[in-house]
Every structure is written in C-alpha cells, then in structure tokens.
Amino acid sequence: MDDQGCPRCKTTKYRNPSLKLMVNVCGHTLCESCVDLLFVRGAGNCPECGTPLRKSNFRVQLFEDPTVDKEVEIRKKVLKIYNKREEDFPSLREYNDFLEEVEEIVFNLTNNVDLENTKKKMEIYQKENKDVIQKNKLKLTREQEELEEALEVERQEHEQRRLFIQKEEELQQALKRKNKQAFLDELESSDLPVALLLAQHKDRSTQLEMQLEKPRSMKPVTFSTGIKMGQQISLAPIQKLEEALYEYQPLQIETCGPQVPEQELLGRLGYLNHVRAASPQDLAGGYTSSLACHRALQDAFSGLFWQPR
C-alpha cells in the first residue's frame, strides 16, 4: 500500500488511507487534489509525460498497476472500432487472425510501440469498414436492451416473490395468534378439564404447523443467465437406449519389429531361463516373471525393422 501514491505531491496511501488516485489515457496517476489543482481550467499536460489531457477523462484508479487501467480503457476504445464477430468471417482462421490483430493494436497503444503506424492502421480500417462497424453497434445496442429488459423482469419477479413470502409469513403469524386466542377463550368459558383442552390445542397447533409447512409450488422463472429457478426436478428414470452390445476389438500395435511371443509361450521358448523368479511377496502384489520379460521383449523388438525414408 505504501508504494501507491501520487508522484507529484508524494502522498502515499500508507500515510493517507483515504487517498483517491486518478488515472488518464496516458496511464500516469495523480491524486484527486493534484487533478483539481493542475486542471482547474479543464485541460492541461501530464506532469510525467507532457501528454495533453482533459480533466473529464480522469477516472478513479481500479488496479494497483496503472498500466492495467490504461490497457482497459484502450481496449474499450479499440473494440468500439474492431467490433466484428465470428459470424462476420467465412472461417475460424480469419476470425482468429482478426483477434490477434486486435491484441497487437492494444499492446502497441498500451506500451507506446509504433504509435503512428498503429493509429494510421486504425483510421484506415475504420474508413473501409464504416458500414459493418455501424451495423454491429446497432446489433450490440439491441442485445444490451434485451439484457436490460431481462434484468428488469428478473427484478420485478424477485420483488413479487419477496412480497408473496412476506404475506405468507404474516398470514402464518395471524393464524398462530388466532389459534392461541381461541385456546385462551376456551379456558375461560369451557367446563372441560384443562388437560383435555390443552391436548386439543396441541393437536390443532400440530395440524396448523403441518399445513403451513406444505411446500407451495412456484412458477418457474427464467433469469437473465438462462437458468430456471423454482422448477420441480424430475426424478423419473432415464429411458433406456436400445443399442448393440459392445464388441471387443483387439488393439493393433505397429512396432516396426519382430512379433513378440505370447506371455504363455515365454517359458517354453527359453526366454525365462535368465529372468529372476518371482518371490511370494511379488506374486501377492501381482508381479510375474513372464510379465516383466514380455515388457522387456516389447521394448527390445520395437523399431528393429524401421528404415528412414
């Protein structure tokens, strides 16, 4: 925290935790007091790099590294021009090349690399694709409106559910108070024994609790994320698919070498004569001499017939 501070007045967040740092398009930070002092006329030059700046373009620094704030702002401006989508390209390769070009432009503008040619390239692209840029802007605006409408519907439905739950709770409290008052009235006016009245009141209270605890079905609501909330989950078994039985196909391995004998034939062919016999402890763990010998033969025979082309 003590590393974050205003380069002009040298005030740090360690000394002043409420310090508000501002950043502009050049990526250099200034505290709010220095911004008000240096840009009292609405415009001025950055004390670090001398770039002409407007006071209205200053914004609160969100990231610890001001370069990240600069990159975020540059990316927003670049994407307003380079706003093509995947469906605007005939192939995925061309779309990926377009995305790579966008990243290169953002990198150059963020790190001050070849600024003149990069800005000229953006101007040429903007002129050549003016119609496509405008069409995608309108498309994006429509999608934002649809998203805002979905969020508003979600908010209204959430408010309706909240009011519904609140009314249910108030109704439950009213029924409980009514039941309690009825019990008190019976105690005053009835000639029945208190134990019997108490048992009847307990039974009525239990039935009332069971009625109140019954789950109420709620209408499924589709949120802006596309997830339906409140819907009942079906526990019915999945329908069995009638398919042909799996048929095992032996694995065909091309070793470019002689055929390795089967494991069962290694002892007859003399391959196990000089292989250490497996101990009882080895056998308990699943180890056999023929298994190790078979693996060694596979490694030894592999690639013996290979010839370079």
From Swiss-Prot:
Subcellular localization is given as:
Nucleus
Q: Which residues are annotated as modified residue Phosphothreonine in the UniProt record? A: T51
The protein's UniProt keywords, in alphabetical order, are: Acetylation, Cell cycle, Metal-binding, Nucleus, Phosphoprotein, Transcription, Transcription regulation, Zinc, Zinc-finger
User: Which GO molecular function annotation, any one, does this entry have?
Assistant: zinc ion binding
Q: Which residues carry this modification: Phosphoserine?
A: S279
Name the Gene3D superfamilies on file: Zinc/RING finger domain, C3HC4 (zinc finger) (3.30.40.10)
Q: What are the recorded Gene Ontology BP terms?
A: adult heart development; G1/S transition of mitotic cell cycle; negative regulation of apoptotic process; nucleotide-excision repair; positive regulation of smooth muscle cell proliferation; regulation of DNA-templated transcription; regulation of G1/S transition of mitotic cell cycle; regulation of transcription by RNA polymerase II
Q: What is this protein called?
A: CDK-activating kinase assembly factor MAT1
Source species? Mus musculus
